[in-house]
């Protein structure tokens, strides 16, 4: 069966870059590596005492800290899968690095404005990346969209914390 032909009789150029076929081994290795990096980062943060202040009033919808850590591990597994599935791997690595930096700009500065700005930039990048890779790998786009959804939740949580405890700027 022949492909579509243009007026010149040649196939039109492909605009969408397609990723190379993904083997199970590469998929598993990238997932394991990203989860390991996230787990090591979470462990280091816990060992260094990077915990939110206990004096804050938390909104009723805030999940326990352990749940947040588990969700991030699952999200990093999804980003690892997206890294293996998407053709634009550098862009996925940038998202992974932005998410690894998340605890540092949220807790290190203890500043609601910094948290919001970081969330907005990370959210905008995640949405852009999901839209960019959606034709390369719809599954990778779904994994990245899950990160964006969680960042929306985190942003709502930051706004609620600021409202309940006063803005720290």
What do these predicted regions represent?
Residues 35-43, 95-105, 148-156:
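Aromatic-anchored segments of alpha-helical transmembrane domains
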Residues 2-24:
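Short, Lys/Arg-rich, polar N-terminal cytosolic tail immediately upstream
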Residues 16-45:
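N-terminal signal-anchor transmembrane alpha helix
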Residues 72-83, 94-100, 122-123:
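Core segments of transmembrane alpha-helices
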Residues 48-61, 166-169:
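Membrane-interface helix termini and inter-helical loops of multi-pass transporters
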Residues 58-71:
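Short aromatic-rich membrane-water interface segments that cap or initiate transmembrane helices
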Residues 104-116, 135, 164:
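Membrane-interface helix caps and helix-loop-helix hairpins in membrane proteins
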């Amino acid at each position: 069966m022949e492909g579509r032909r243009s007026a010149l009789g040649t196939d039109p150029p492909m605009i969408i870059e397609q990723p190379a076929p993904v083997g199970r081994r590469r998929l598993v290795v990238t997932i394991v590596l990203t989860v390991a990096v996230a787990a090591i980062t979470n462990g280091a943060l816990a060992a260094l005492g990077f915990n939110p202040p206990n004096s804050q009033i938390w909104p009723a919808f805030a999940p326990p800290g352990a749940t947040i850590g588990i969700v991030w591990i699952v999200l990093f597994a999804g980003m690892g899968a997206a890294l293996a599935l998407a053709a634009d791997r550098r862009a996925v690595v940038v998202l992974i690095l932005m998410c690894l930096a998340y605890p540092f700009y949220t807790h290190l500065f203890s500043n609601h404005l910094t948290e919001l700005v970081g969330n907005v930039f990370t959210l905008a990048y995640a949405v852009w990346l999901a839209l960019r890779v959606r034709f390369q790998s719809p599954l990778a786009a779904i994994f990245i969209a899950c990160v964006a959804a969680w960042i929306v939740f985190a942003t709502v949580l930051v706004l609620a914390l600021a409202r309940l405890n006063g803005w720290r700027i």
